[in-house]
């Protein structure tokens, strides 16, 4: 009796071990609240004065980005369309004939008077000894299309001010939704004169522009084949 109870208990332990453990979702990290700070007291303002300490640097200039560390808004409006089509057709026909009409000054009939129509009696255009012909044809058609559209606005920071009024700017944005992270990176050269009155510039006015838009996560992984498929594509010779 004790052996039966022991066997039944072992069986129950084994069956409970086969049950897959339920995966608990990872806890959401708590949101860190920003620390409050005391704002400095405002100096006594004169209602009848046009001067303000907060706007003192803009008395004789606007708020456009011109110095290192300034922020400029980059309006990315990119619509690219490309289409390429190629057709190739090639035909080649070749005909060769070989015959002997004379040999060391003797005609083919005098070489073999018994059988004037022997194997060496042929002439080009009449009865050639050897005749070959070949025909080659090649036809190919290729077409490629690509279209992309990116529209967004990114705040970029001035990294360097180059001679001639050029500013090197760079900005990035990271957006995370659930388990998917999207990255947008913009960098390039901007002329100070191209910065509009609202402190913005379009991506078409940037030189050496580099715009990257990519993501990491579940959706990005599903958009590409698996590692074994990519491996077979690289090593497959056919």
Swiss-Prot record:
This is Flagellar L-ring protein. Residues 1-17 form the signal peptide. Transmembrane segments: none annotated. The lineage of its organism: Bacteria, Pseudomonadati, Thermodesulfobacteriota, Desulfovibrionia, Desulfovibrionales. It holds the Pfam family FlgH. The basal body constitutes a major portion of the flagellar organelle and consists of four rings (L,P,S, and M) mounted on a central rod. Disulfide bonds: none annotated. InterPro entries: Flag_Lring (IPR000527). Residues 22-50 are annotated as: Disordered. The keyword Membrane applies. It comes from the Bacteria.
